[in-house]
A protein has these predicted regions:
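Polybasic, lysine-rich low-complexity intrinsically disordered segments
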Residues: 7-8
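Residues marking helix boundaries in flexible regions
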Residues: 17-21
Length: 363
């Protein structure tokens, strides 16, 4: 209201306090936290890295996420004298665990804007998203105090009772798996299922995407969420393909299910045979990008083919490539499953290599 004598605006102190509170609250709520996520240059297996950028008035759209930079000399991606590397945003997802948060997957670029040698995403040749990928990500919940999987039996109970099991004697870490699933779904990731695996403390989730790059993005974001979630429980996530060594326990893989228009529509066993045969002469090239220490897993035992051999067959889980029975029942219209990739492999590099081989087939 107005003071009629002084003819100047007059505000009650309560209005001023309320205005200050609302203004401050708006400024806080108008801030967004963008978590830039990238892969470092460590070998033989890259690690996830991330850092947070706080921005104002963010639209939530990928095109409004700015390029950023980081110290590549601290991640084995640059020398100290010229250490800046660039982060190019390629995918964005809401972060359900942080207020006004977003998870931003990025590619690493050199300072001149070219793709860094560690950038597997840039090697994918699938501009029209004709290739569809479904990755089956296995992992172990690892107890740092015992240096063993969560729930690993002291009496050396043999594997068998733990796969898709229920009960406190058989299933370990279900709460983490369930929370991870919920967070991934809330973030918009296309998780299609989860299950307990053959060993205690071993779990799996499956992600599918119509597009190779997006499938890789979602696997890496899901891995990031899982690593961060495990921090709450004081546990580590172990993606080593054979963390228990040369024992009678299954290792961890990341089976790659894939298709393109030809595989989805051809209706021809001959075409499937030709595509599978295209993989035979390039076993070495595939194994090179299918994950470190995979020789410990691909032994010919525990539902694997030997690392230096190649085979394919209908419903054959001991083959390099399995032809799913559903593909056959649908008249040879479906997909293939490469069972060789290890759980620690880079899905970008897996997809890039598979696409290159499929395109080379004489069909």
């Amino acid at each position: 209201m107005y003071n009629v004598y002084k003819k100047t605006p007059y505000y009650h102190s309560g209005y001023i306090i309320n205005f200050i509170f609302v203004s401050s609250y708006y400024k806080i709520m108008n801030k967004s936290k963008l978590e830039y996520i990238w892969l470092d240059g460590y070998k033989p297996t890259a690690n996830l890295r991330s850092k947070t950028k706080v921005v104002s008035d963010f639209s939530g759209k990928l095109e409004d996420v700015e390029m950023w930079s980081f110290d590549g000399s601290s991640t084995l991606q640059a020398e100290g004298g010229s250490s800046d590397c660039l982060l190019k945003p390629v995918a964005i997802y809401p972060d359900p665990e942080r207020r006004n948060g977003y998870l931003v997957m990025t590619e690493v670029l050199n300072a001149d804007g070219s793709a860094h040698v560690s950038n597997g995403r840039a090697t994918i040749e699938d501009d029209d998203d004709d290739f569809w990928f479904g990755f089956e990500q296995e992992y172990f919940l690892w107890d740092p105090e015992t240096n063993l999987p969560l729930g690993f039996p002291k009496d050396q109970t043999p594997q068998g009772q733990f796969y898709c099991s229920v009960g406190a004697k058989n299933s370990f870490g279900r709460e983490i798996m369930d929370r991870h699933l919920d967070i991934c779904l809330d973030a918009g990731l296309n998780v299609e299922g989860t299950n307990g695996e053959v060993a205690p403390g071993q779990w799996e989730f499956q992600i599918f995407s119509k597009g190779a790059a997006e499938a890789g993005d979602q696997i890496w974001i899901a891995r990031y969420i899982l690593e961060r979630l495990a921090e709450d429980y004081g546990l580590a996530i172990d993606y080593h393909p054979k963390p228990l060594g040369a024992t009678d326990w299954n290792g961890s893989g990341m089976h790659a299910n894939f298709s393109n228009t030809t595989l989805r529509t051809c209706g021809s066993k001959e075409t499937y045979d030709k595509i599978c045969e295209a993989f035979r002469p390039v076993v070495k090239e595939h194994i090179e990008v299918y994950g470190a220490y995979n020789d410990q897993r691909l032994t010919g035992d525990h539902e694997t083919q030997s690392i230096d051999a190649f085979s394919y067959g209908v419903s054959d889980r001991g083959a390099s490539i399995r032809i799913p029975i559903m593909t056959v029942e649908k008249g040879w219209k479906g997909w293939l499953e490469d069972r060789r990739p290890a759980s620690n492999a880079d899905p970008y590099k897996i997809a890039a290599r598979i696409i290159k081989t499929v395109k080379s087939a004489d069909v």
